[in-house]
Curated annotation (Swiss-Prot):
Residues 28-174 are extracellular. Residues 25-93, 206-278 are annotated as: Disordered. Residues 209-225 have a biased composition (Polar residues). The gene is Pianp. It comes from Mus musculus. GO terms for molecular function: protein domain specific binding. The lineage of its organism: Eukaryota, Metazoa, Chordata, Craniata, Vertebrata. It comes from the Eukaryota. GO terms for biological process: cerebellum development; dentate gyrus development; gamma-aminobutyric acid signaling pathway; gene expression; glutamate secretion; homeostasis of number of cells; regulation of immune response; response to stress. Keywords: Glycoprotein, Membrane, Signal, Transmembrane, Transmembrane helix. It is a single-pass type I membrane protein. It is found in: Membrane. Mainly expressed in brain and spinal cord. Weak expression also detected in heart, kidney, spleen and lymph node. Virtually no expression detected in liver and embryo relative to brain. One of its GO terms (cellular component) is presynapse. This is PILR alpha-associated neural protein. Glycans are attached at T136.
């Protein structure tokens, strides 16, 4: 019982004990003395000692995304950095293992300064990127520049070499050879079909002219035939028809009634027409 009474009396004193244990806050009256003033960076004579100026690095000001980045200043006599701007975190995610870094596109003949046209691009010392790495500098190389156009031209990457005139490496697809072979075969077959069609057409034009000449010769040698009901007589080309005898002559007025007709006499002697075999 007495312990419970003691705890009930000590509970209100806990805040006072905590305040006495905690250290003083930074915002209290105990402040650090001010730092001494830095000496000005004034360059004196050659014998005067130089003051060491140590400046703290201020945080870079925030730039809006619309403001272009300034060109890096390259000190003459020193090589530019091997990693161009925009590639610090690695090469861009692309399906091509190489990249082309273009320079300014303003000609020097127009009076423009190529180094100040596009401040976001790399200097003229940079060229094409390596096939398996980042861009490599080419300082003072005339072969990387065009004839006054301001474009950076260098050796073509291995992936862009022409197929027929360049080196054939392991990356050539064998299906390309199959496609070329099939295309050549199709062209040859089509040419043969066209030639055969023209030849048959020319032969068909010559045959009717020869057949017409043969028919004309046959018509000139064809004899005349007699189509009478009694019989058929073959007459020559210049043969004369047989003259009928008085017994076989039929009177002009027709057969008289009561007069017998001669036996074997044809009923129609005048119905003779030429027969032509077509």
């Amino acid at each position: 019982m007495w312990s419970a009474q003691l705890l009930s009396q000590l509970l209100p004193l806990w805040p006072l004990l905590l305040l006495s244990v905690l250290p003083p806050a930074q915002g209290s009256s105990h402040r650090s003395p001010p730092a001494p003033a830095r000496p000005p960076c004034v360059r004196g004579g050659p014998s005067a000692p130089r003051h060491v100026c140590v400046w703290e690095r201020a945080p870079p000001p925030s730039r809006s995304p619309r403001v272009p980045r300034s060109r890096r200043q390259v000190v003459p006599g020193t090589a530019p950095p091997a990693t161009p701007s925009g590639f610090e975190e690695g090469p861009p995610s692309s399906q091509y293992p190489w990249a082309i870094v273009w320079g300014p596109t303003v000609s020097r003949e127009d009076g423009g300064d190529p180094n100040s046209v596009n401040p976001g691009f790399l200097p003229l010392d940079y060229g094409f990127a390596a096939p398996h790495g980042l861009a490599t500098p080419h300082p003072n190389s005339d072969s990387m520049r065009d004839d006054g156009d301001g474009l950076i031209l260098g050796e073509t990457p291995a992936t862009l070499r022409p197929f027929l005139f360049g080196g054939r490496g392991e990356g050539v697809d064998p299906q390309l050879y199959v496609t070329i072979t099939i295309s050549i075969i199709i062209v040859l077959v089509a040419t043969g079909i066209i030639f055969k069609f023209c030849w048959d057409r020319s032969q068909k034009r010559r045959r009717p002219s020869g057949q017409q000449g043969a028919l004309r010769q046959e018509e000139s040698q064809q004899p005349l035939t007699d189509l009478s009901p009694a019989g058929v007589t073959v007459l020559g080309a210049f043969g004369d028809s047989p003259t009928p005898t008085p017994d076989h002559e039929e009177p002009r007025g027709g057969p008289r009634p009561g007069m017998p007709q001669p036996k074997g006499a044809p009923a129609f002697q005048l119905n003779r027409i030429p027969l032509v075999n077509l």
